[in-house]
A protein has these predicted regions:
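A short, compositionally biased
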Residues: 27, 141-143, 212, 261
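Extracellular beta-strand/loop-rich repeat segments of large surface/secreted proteins
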Residues: 131, 173, 178, 182-336
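Acidic Ser/Thr/Pro-rich low-complexity disordered segments
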Residues: 21-34, 146-149, 188-200, 244-247, ...
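Short amphipathic beta-strand/extended segments with alternating polar/hydrophobic composition
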Residues: 25-27, 38, 77, 115, ...
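Fold-core signature of tandem repeat domains
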Residues: 4-9, 15-17, 23, 39-44, ...
Length: 343
């Protein structure tokens, strides 16, 4: 590797190297060094980049306009500002990184404790945990816009005010949503627009999900939800979107739903029979069913599974004008379902 000492990097200067190099110097933000596979304090901008080789480490790197960090080893405490890009390849790992407005993080390896404070993160078949999404930032699991990666996984995701998370393919396990939005798309089949790892890219939600005040989760039809427990607090909204299903009947299948003052929306096209299959549905709250069906029958909606609590039902048309709201779910005598009854 190259050897250079006492470098003075002026504002806007570009440095390109790998962790095989031996260099040190200073820039407007402080001092930097690269030695024996360890890099610290670099400022990368204007086309400058650092490649962190397998078995090597980099930390406290700043990525600015057109600066890049390419990681096959490990990295931590990276700050990605506008125009900067962090790429973690399979086998690489990143921790405690901050992605600010205009910054980009592309992950195919592993990441933990990432703060998205205005930037964008795409998980391309990698694994991330304890990611925080807020302040206008966007997190995407399973896509780069051209291909779907069904092997990706995110755990313990937090989506706060102004944050948005999209699950295009892969698994979301455990999430807390407070003031943000999470969208699970319907599973996508291979077509002319997407390349997928298999014939189909599954979308899966598992573990515990909490929707707190002003939080929303929108789930496309066909996503796998049976291993999830979703709790909807006051001010939270869970939307199960079956509007793509044509025909008279729509069946939504979920694991457990706890309504603690929140709302569950069931969106249909023109279905005349709607079934919600759950392991358990309990608590106090409202189910709002949206349909463009011309007639509403007494058996329009039924629930299969354990049902307890005080759950009211409202039926609206496609513009969400109320058709009927004096309804509630009445648990069956056998305790394994519920039907629609006058409130």
């Amino acid at each position: 590797g190259a050897i250079a000492t006492d470098i003075v990097q002026s504002e806007g200067g570009a440095i390109s190297l790998s962790t095989l190099a031996t260099v040190n110097g200073r820039h407007p933000e402080g001092e930097f060094s690269v030695d024996k596979g360890y890099a610290c304090g670099l400022l990368l901008e204007n086309g400058g980049n650092l490649r962190v080789l397998e078995g090597h480490r980099a930390e406290k790197i700043i990525l600015d306009q057109e600066g890049g960090l390419l990681v096959n080893g490990t990295t931590s405490a990276v700050v990605v500002d506008e125009g900067g890009e962090l790429l973690v390849y399979p086998g690489g790992e990143a921790s405690n990184c901050e992605i600010n407005q205009g910054g980009v993080f592309m992950l195919a390896g592993k990441a933990s404790d990432t703060l998205l404070a205005g930037g964008t993160m795409n998980n391309l078949g990698g694994e991330d945990s304890d990611t925080i999404v807020e302040n206008g930032s966007i997190y995407r699991l399973g896509t780069d816009g051209l291909q779907l990666y069904s092997s990706g996984k995110t755990q313990n995701l937090s989506v706060n005010v102004g944050g948005r998370a999209e699950v295009h393919a892969g698994t979301l396990e455990n999430a807390v949503i407070q003031g943000g939005t999470v969208i699970l798309l319907s599973p996508t089949s291979a077509d002319e627009n997407f390349v997928v790892e298999e014939d189909r890219a599954p979308v899966e939600l598992t573990g515990s999900v909490a929707l707190l005040d002003d939080a929303s989760m929108i789930i496309g039809y066909g996503a796998e939800l049976q291993q999830s427990t979703i709790t909807v607090q006051q001010g939270g909204v869970l939307i199960l979107d079956g509007s793509t299903v044509k025909g008279d009947g729509v069946t939504f299948i979920v694991g457990n739903i706890n309504l603690n003052g929140g709302k569950l929306w069931l969106i249909t096209d023109a279905a005349t029979h709607v079934q919600l299959k759950v392991k358990r549905l309990r608590g106090e709250g409202a189910i709002c069913l949206q349909t463009s069906a011309k007639e509403i029958s007494p058996d329009f909606i039924n629930v299969k599974g354990e049902v307890t609590g005080d759950i009211h039902v409202e039926i609206t048309d496609a513009s969400r004008q109320t058709l009927c709201n004096a309804l509630k779910l009445q648990p069956d005598e056998d305790g394994i379902g519920a039907t629609l009854q006058p409130a």
